[in-house]
Curated annotation (Swiss-Prot):
Natural source organism: Oreochromis niloticus
One GO cellular component term noted in the UniProt record for this chain: extracellular region
The protein's name in its UniProt record: Somatostatin-2
Any Pfam family the entry gives: Somatostatin
Cystine pairings recorded for this chain: 17-28
Function: Somatostatin inhibits the release of somatotropin.
Gene field: sst2
Keywords of the record: Cleavage on pair of basic residues, Disulfide bond, Hormone, Secreted
Compartment(s) of residence: Secreted
Length: 28
């Protein structure tokens, strides 16, 4: 969830879904 950046780093949130975060998409 993009609402918990403090709990899980955006780049460590999901190895395969880290790209979605940088792009700004929440399709993961």
């Amino acid at each position: 969830s993009a609402d918990q950046p403090n709990s899980i780093p955006p780049r460590e949130r999901k190895a395969g879904c880290k790209n979605f975060y940088w792009k700004g998409l929440t399709s993961c």
